[in-house]
Structures are given as structure tokens and as C-alpha cells.
Amino acid sequence: MKINKYVEDLKAKSAAELNEELVAAKKELFNLRFQNATNQLDNTSRIKEVRKNIARIQTVIAQKNA
């Protein structure tokens, strides 16, 4: 149910807030990939989690624009 709560929180946000969150998530993904390439990342599953969150944010943005 944790994911459903996250999606509901996303749906409650405005388009500007969603765009800010999307930019922040993409920056985090970039940093995680960089850490993974330099063997500094312990929790590699975080990359997958952030990628899915980016997709969730983009989906909510598309739903709001439709």
C-alpha cells in the first residue's frame, strides 16, 4: 500500500510541483548511476526504485494534461 499512497500524493500536487519532483528524481538517478559506476553504491535496488518513481510521476503528469 506504500506505492498507492505515493501515487495519491502525486495526484494531489500541481503540475509545477510534479515537474519539480521529476527534475529532482532525475538528478537523483544521475547521481545513483554515477555512484554505481564508481562502485560507491551499496543499495543498487535504489536505481530501479527511482526509475519507477520517475515513470509514476510522468504518468500522473500525462493524466493531468489529458
Swiss-Prot record:
One CC-aspect GO term: cytosolic large ribosomal subunit
Key words, A-Z: Ribonucleoprotein, Ribosomal protein
CDD domains for the chain: Ribosomal_L29_HIP (cd00427)
Highest rank taxon of the organism: Bacteria
Keyword Transferase: no
Entry's family note: Belongs to the universal ribosomal protein uL29 family.
Biological process per Gene Ontology, one example term: translation
Gene Ontology terms, MF aspect: structural constituent of ribosome
HAMAP family per record: Ribosomal_uL29
Disulfide bond residue pairs: none
Protein name according to UniProt: Large ribosomal subunit protein uL29
Record InterPro entries: Ribosomal_protein_uL29 (IPR050063), Ribosomal_uL29 (IPR001854), Ribosomal_uL29_CS (IPR018254), Ribosomal_uL29_sf (IPR036049)
